[in-house]
């Protein structure tokens, strides 16, 4: 079954993976804005929530109501599970819980790795060595001067290594130079768990008429820490979801017609062609099960 959180609601729909029809609903009995779901056992999962809580649910019938509402100091959006632990990134650091002891009193914090308004939409990722990765913006005063990918050892609950992609300070950048970050960045990892993908703003051209930019996908090799340009995303300034398919194609969630609550899934192929799929509601996430 698929478990889908509904934005600005107090419920989770249980979806049949073949018919895509709802086969059940988990309805909250108190305030909540469910966001992301991670399994902690064959029968239970934890749901992140904007209401500064984690919610434990049943993933087998009878689904019923949530099993537990767990208050935490700060809200968490994206979660990952490694080594019977849950990691969740907040503005105050990464929270760490044991899956058999999820409580405000039992939380540990990795304080040096934290998100901000424009990185809170980045998924935490797990590589082939079962290490946890997170993206942060590096600042000098009010200026973002680099994008840092931080690797966390889940056993030690400490930063193992980090790699930074600097943002150009050139007065006259050249085409292809990284010149900025984007609003609400996103991350993904390839099926081999070797490459981490994220988004930047690059210089498209620098002429007498001025500098033009384009949103671009960069990727980093988890073994070498080397960064490389992957694909440009012309026509995109901000997105609601981002994923790279097993074939290496980029899929974005875009929303243009706010009044009618309609949006698009955009597929950027490696040959430069683009496919667009109009969908019925605001799309916010793309997954490849």
Predicted segment positions?
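Residue position within the beta-strands of beta-propeller blades
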Residues: 4-5, 47, 88, 134, ...
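Short loop/turn segments that connect beta-strands within beta-propeller blades
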Residues: 16-20, 59-63, 98-103, 153-157, ...
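Repeated scaffold domains used in trafficking and secretory/extracellular systems
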Residues: 32-39, 74-83, 116-127, 177-188, ...
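A short beta-strand motif characteristic of beta-propeller blades
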Residues: 21-28, 63-70, 104-114, 158-177, ...
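Intrinsically disordered, low-complexity segments enriched in Gly and acidic/Ser/Thr residues
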Residues: 163-261
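Blade-loop segments of beta-propeller domains
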Residues: 21-42
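Short coil/turn segments that connect the beta-strands within blades of beta-propeller domains
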Residues: 1, 42-43, 83-84, 129-130, ...
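Structural motif
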Residues: 10-14, 53-57, 93-98, 141-150, ...
């Amino acid at each position: 079954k698929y478990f889908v959180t509904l934005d600005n609601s107090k419920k989770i729909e249980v979806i049949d993976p073949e018919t895509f029809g709802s086969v059940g609903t988990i309805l909250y009995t108190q305030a909540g804005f469910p966001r992301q779901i991670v399994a902690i056992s064959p029968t239970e999962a934890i749901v992140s929530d904007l209401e500064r809580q984690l919610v434990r649910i049943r993933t087998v019938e009878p689904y019923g109501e949530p099993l537990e509402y767990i208050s935490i100091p700060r809200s968490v959006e994206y979660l990952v599970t490694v080594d019977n632990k849950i990691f969740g990134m907040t503005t105050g650091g990464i929270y760490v819980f044991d899956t058999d002891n999820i409580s405000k009193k039992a939380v540990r914090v990795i304080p040096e790795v934290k998100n901000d308004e424009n990185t809170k939409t980045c998924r935490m990722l797990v590589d082939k060595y079962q290490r946890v990765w997170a993206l942060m913006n590096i600042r000098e005063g009010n200026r973002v001067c680099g994008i840092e990918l931080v690797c966390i050892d889940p056993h030690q609950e400490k930063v193992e290594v980090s790699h930074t992609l600097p943002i150009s300070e050139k007065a006259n950048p050249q085409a292809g130079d990284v010149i900025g970050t984007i609003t609400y960045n996103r991350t993904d990892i390839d099926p081999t768990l070797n490459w981490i993908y994220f988004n930047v703003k690059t210089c498209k051209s620098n002429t007498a008429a001025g500098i033009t930019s384009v949103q671009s996908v960069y990727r980093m090799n988890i073994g070498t820490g080397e960064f490389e340009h992957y694909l440009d995303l012309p026509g995109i300034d901000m997105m609601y979801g981002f994923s790279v398919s097993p074939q290496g194609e980029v899929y974005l969630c875009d929303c243009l017609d706010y009044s009618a609550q309609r949006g698009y899934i955009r597929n950027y192929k490696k040959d430069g062609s683009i496919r667009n799929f109009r969908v019925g509601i605001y799309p916010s996430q793309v997954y490849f099960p």
